[in-house]
Amino acid sequence: MILRIPSLLYLFTLLTAVYAVKFDLTSDRNPKPSIIWNFASAHSLVIVTANVPGEPDQQVDIQILDGSERGNVYLSKKDVRGEARLAVTTHESADVGVCLTNRYTGSGNPRVVRSVELDVDIGADAIDYNAIANQESLSILEVEMRKLEAVTKEIVEEMGYLQRREMRMRDTNESTNQRVKVFSVLIICCTIGLGVWQLLHLRSFFKRKYLID
């Protein structure tokens, strides 16, 4: 089957995702973090571009971490002003979070809002294919095929990660169900034992009162 260039570009557009958001970040003396989560495969390049306009008495801090069991913290940057471009490489397949806090350092009303623009490029989206094309003299079709190959690889890795996570959750559910079954059996045994003890106690009581032989 022949795949034409427009069809290839359309398919690539469907597979790629753009993680760009603009939101207001409220300052506080003890600010609560705002976290943007995106999935990233192991050993993936993650580029975070943050545009933070400079405002007096406000300090915006950025931290890049993941939601794995280890809780890896890849980068921390204090007092970000203007445009900041941060790049990290993930250690394992997990959700990667960009954590932002806006700390108020002045003496007046701490509830001040700052508008923040955040762009997160992961894996194939973070690679500069124009530079690769110039370096290796690739045609447009070859560049798009290279992009499509990288995106397909990421999809396969993400599906594998979801499958492994589903297996872990299933094992946890089975283990929990087994413990519940054992606990239920113990409860039933204790209930039966208590009932037998009460019957014996009542029988002994009635004998002492000469109500039964």
Swiss-Prot record:
The keyword Nucleotide-binding does not apply. Residues 203-213 are cytoplasmic. Residues 1-20 form the signal peptide. InterPro entries: Emp24-like, GOLD_dom. Residues 21-181 are lumenal. SMART domains: EMP24_GP25L. It holds the Pfam family EMP24_GP25L. GO terms for biological process: endoplasmic reticulum to Golgi vesicle-mediated transport; protein transport. It comes from the Eukaryota. The chain crosses the membrane at residues 182-202. It is a single-pass type I membrane protein. It is found in: Endoplasmic reticulum membrane; Golgi apparatus membrane. Belongs to the EMP24/GP25L family. Constituent of COPII-coated endoplasmic reticulum-derived transport vesicles. Required for efficient transport of a subset of secretory proteins to the Golgi. Facilitates retrograde transport from the Golgi to the endoplasmic reticulum. This is Endoplasmic reticulum vesicle protein 25. It comes from Cryptococcus neoformans var. neoformans serotype D (strain B-3501A) (Filobasidiella neoformans).
